[in-house]
Amino acid sequence: MKASATGRILMWRGGSLWIGLAGEPAGMHAHHAVQITLPFNGGGARFQVPGEPWTNYSAAIVAAQQPHAFEARGQMMAQIFVEPESRDGRALQLLHRAQGIAALDDSISSEVEALAAAFESRATGTALIELAHSAIRKLVGPSQSTATPPDARIAQALELIRERLSGPVSLKPIAQAVHLSPDRFRHLFMEETGVGFRPYVLWQRLDCSLAAYVKGSTLTEAAHDGGFADSAHFSRTFRKMFGIAPASVRPE
């Protein structure tokens, strides 16, 4: 989706909303976030996982790290990405941990209609983000209160990673800062986030660069904001994690 008159990308701590007209198909990719795909006006989207045929969905949730390709060209829709270590993400993982891609029923239809209407009426970013959170809350229901809170040391480590993205981020200094041995930290980090330390840092770099890019930075400027060596590294990482080129979400 282009972040233009036909689409917007809105980001918050722990998630983002991509809303508008779906563009080019996304090749096989995998990302750290849980993905919630909500086509508008009774439309649909197609997903493919490795070794399987394409499957149609009227709405779907994709688990974190699940490889998939995606196609919904010309379809108006919302895509909500939720980091699995966030409170909402932990609740979503609790509900859908055994399923790579799962269909969503029409119990969320009113939230989808509200998102569609708000986008059509050019609602503010704040209003759209609140509607995205409403959709997430509808999906997680009571499970949010039963999700295990993150380990405090890993929560602190995640903060430190975000603070250091403009430069090198390595495991040993972060482990020392939260008073864990590197080996114990590596194990606990994987246990808490579902991903290794280096891939998580790369995801956070991508998130930081994307936030800058959709606000109008050039590819090179956005790459440097996230600590990438250059725009080529940013572009390769973006395609690996989203299946499309960053130019596909070019800002206005």
Predicted regions and their residues:
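N-terminal regulatory/effector-sensing and dimerization cores
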Residues: 2-98
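Short, Lys/Arg-enriched, Trp-marked, Pro/Gly-tolerant hinge/linker segments that flank
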Residues: 99-178, 191-199, 203
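Short coil turns linking two alpha-helices in DNA-binding domains
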Residues: 181, 229-230
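Terminal helix-turn-helix DNA-binding modules in bacterial transcription factors
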Residues: 168-173, 191-229, 251-252
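Short hydrophobic/aromatic patch on the recognition helix
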Residues: 185, 189, 233-234, 238
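Short, charged, intrinsically disordered terminal tails
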Residues: 93, 141-144, 250-252
